[in-house]
């Protein structure tokens, strides 16, 4: 038994003891959790009780963005040792599956992902996890930054899928946490400038403080107009759709240059219209993103090198004993909040 933040059912959280796995296989590690980020999917399970086909039918521990310390290693683990500071990739695929063998383990149908029913998450003091999906953090990278690797990895995956070339002009629709991570990954990946569009000025103020980022408030100016003015009527080389909003998705052909690339990162709640002819008329290349695969090392190196600074995106750090309040704050969706983190007792 261990104390954990448990989603009992839709709209009901509790901090209580719950049975958790403690047995170590030869390829596992036991990790003492130190910092956990609150993700939009965690909040959605809290408020709606489900995401698509994944329904909370029994109590589930929340949390999947985490960093911590190795407490024990399995007998076959060689790249980690007790005391190592680590972050964890929360999806555990079947390594013998066809998807995994193709290197796209993120779309393995049998993947078990933290805090996705019926799999428990990591908002509990200790977790057992495969060493293969546990990554050492450099000494100067904090636990808070380590817990940001998971959402940043989505941005890195998007940047890689985009096939950015040095000097490209990027555009990001949506200034939520993933939109911001994607914009920073696109800059690190070679974009000379990235335009970020959103309705919420406080969010734009946060991401706009970064060098190389320009913001567009869509309440004040159409994104297509702003990008046309900035690119001599040409359009962005790469457009990342991170909002999941139907109007933004429908407008995509008007934002990209002829022969450009559109990367679909945001996930609409319901099916949305898509301008296929508009895409065809410009021969736009369309890429999609689902989580990430084989990018954690890259994400950690970008943070460790100082190339990407995610610390300004951490809006609040709240103690584990107040984690229900942390989730209630996340539900509020305060205009200036980007990432709320929960700090576990050492």
Curated annotation (Swiss-Prot):
Q: Does the keyword Transport apply?
A: no
Molecular-function annotations in GO: D-xylulose reductase activity; zinc ion binding
Which PROSITE patterns does this UniProt record tie to the protein?
ADH_ZINC
Organism encoding this protein: Rhizobium meliloti (strain 1021) (Ensifer meliloti)
Could you say which EC number(s) this protein's record lists? 1.1.1.9
Cofactor(s) needed for function: Zn(2+)
Where Zn(2+) binds, per the record, is at: 39, 64, 150
Q: What Pfam families has UniProt attached to this entry?
A: ADH_N, ADH_zinc_N
Q: What name goes with this protein?
A: Putative D-xylulose reductase
Keyword annotations of the record: Metal-binding, NAD, Oxidoreductase, Zinc
Which cysteine pairs are joined by S-S bonds?
none
| Gene3D superfamilies per record | Medium-chain alcohol dehydrogenases, catalytic domain, NAD(P)-binding Rossmann-like Domain
What is catalysed by this protein? Answer: xylitol + NAD(+) = D-xylulose + NADH + H(+)
Which family does the record assign? Belongs to the zinc-containing alcohol dehydrogenase family.
What InterPro entries does the annotation carry? Answer: ADH-like_C, ADH-like_N, ADH_Zn_CS, GroES-like_sf, NAD(P)-bd_dom_sf, PKS_ER, SDH-like
Cofactor details (free text): Binds 1 zinc ion per subunit.
Q: Is-annotated flag, keyword tRNA-binding?
A: no
CDD domains per the record? sorbitol_DH
């Amino acid at each position: 038994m261990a104390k954990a933040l448990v989603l009992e059912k839709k709209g009901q959280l509790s901090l209580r003891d719950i049975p958790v796995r403690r047995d170590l296989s030869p390829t596992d590690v036991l990790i003492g959790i130190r910092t956990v980020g609150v993700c939009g999917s965690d909040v959605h399970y809290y408020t709606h009780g489900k995401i698509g086909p994944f329904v909370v039918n029994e109590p589930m521990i929340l949390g999947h963005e985490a960093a911590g310390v190795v407490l024990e290693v399995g007998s076959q683990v060689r790249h980690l040792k007790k005391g190592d500071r680590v972050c964890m990739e929360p999806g555990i695929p079947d390594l013998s599956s066809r998807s995994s063998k193709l290197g796209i383990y993120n779309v393995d149908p049998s993947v078990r992902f933290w805090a996705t029913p019926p799999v428990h998450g990591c908002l509990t003091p200790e977790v057992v996890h495969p060493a293969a999906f546990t990554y050492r953090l450099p000494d100067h990278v904090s636990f808070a930054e380590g817990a940001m690797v998971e959402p940043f990895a989505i941005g890195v995956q998007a940047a890689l899928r985009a096939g950015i070339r040095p000097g490209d002009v990027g555009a990001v629709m949506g200034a939520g946490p993933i939109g911001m991570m994607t914009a920073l990954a696109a800059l690190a990946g070679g974009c000379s400038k990235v335009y970020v569009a959103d309705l919420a000025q406080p969010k734009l103020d946060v991401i706009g403080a970064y060098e190389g980022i320009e913001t567009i408030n869509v309440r004040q100016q159409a994104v297509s107009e702003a990008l046309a003015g900035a690119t001599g009527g040409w359009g962005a080389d790469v457009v990342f759709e991170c909002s999941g909003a139907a109007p933004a998705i429908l407008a995509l052909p008007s934002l990209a240059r002829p022969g450009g690339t559109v990367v679909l990162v945001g996930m609409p709640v319901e099916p949305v219209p898509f301008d296929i002819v508009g895409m065809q008329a410009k021969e736009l290349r369309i890429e999609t993103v689902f989580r990430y695969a084989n990018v954690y090392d890259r994400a950690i190196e970008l943070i460790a090198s100082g190339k990407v600074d995610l610390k300004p995106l951490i809006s609040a750090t709240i103690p584990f004993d107040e984690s229900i309040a942390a989730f209630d704050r996340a539900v509020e969706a305060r205009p200036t909040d980007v990432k709320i983190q929960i700090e576990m007792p050492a």
